Amino acid sequence: AASIARDLGLPRSTAYHLLSVLQARGYVTHYVEERRFGLGQAAYELGSAYQRQAPFARLARGTMRRLVDQCGRNAHFATLDGRDVIYLLEERAPGQPMLVTDVGVRLPGHLTASGLAMLAGLPASQVRALYPDRSSFTQRHERGPQSLGELRGILTRTRTDGYAREDGTVTPELSSIAVAITDRTGRSPAAIAVTFRSREATDEHVTALVAHTRAAAHDVARRLRPSSVKNPGH
């Protein structure tokens, strides 16, 4: 704790408080005999969840860059882990606002466009298992669904529209649209989203962003399909 306080320039009491919170949540383990702290199980699980999806993100990188070039907006690629989305890839456009969706960040899925796009592809029973009661519905800015019934309504609209949308539930004054990537089994293992300033949200602008994002999602889905590899010697 002393070295952490020194390296971060924090009071020792603050460092101990942070460590106690991290320990309570499983991200830090206290080795009493060694008088040291180390990474906890939750930290390893978080890292392994990201590493499992790293090849998937690599597959999508080129498509994401083209999407940003086409629409001039920040784009991100995420997967669903329980109720959370994990951001695996972010491509930024010049002049666009900074986002909280850095690589490795987790956010509540029901508040994000990416999460809603993927949740819309799950069976109703699985959605119910993920959100058994009102305490499951974390809030960031007092916006977003607060009950299973409200979430189901949003997911129904998402399936009808073919894309998900959030307005200010993650960051005030910013909106996002997202399209799920569907594999050959019909599952939605990931989603691509584009974020824009809410004041830009005219019907024409959103329609264009959805079209670009949908094309990008279809391109990544196509790349996921197994294809025969030809032997150049035959």
Q: Could you say what each language-model-derived stretch is?
A:
Residues R143-A217, H234:
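Extended hydrophobic
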Residues D7, R58-Q70, R157, D161, ...:
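Amphipathic alpha-helical regulatory segments at dimerization interfaces
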Residues Q126-H141, A217-H234:
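Cysteine/selenocysteine-centered motifs that mediate thiol-based redox chemistry or coordinate metal-sulfur cofactors
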Residues E33-E34, G38-R134:
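Amphipathic alpha-helical effector-binding/dimerization core
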Residues G109-T112, T207-P226:
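Short, solvent-exposed cationic patches
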Residues V28-H30, F77-A78, I181:
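A structural signal for short hydrophobic beta-strand segments in well-ordered beta-sheet cores
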Residues A1-R58, H218-P226:
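N-terminal helix-turn-helix
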Residues P108, L116-G121, Q126-L130, T138, ...:
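Regulatory sensory and allosteric helical modules in signal-transduction proteins
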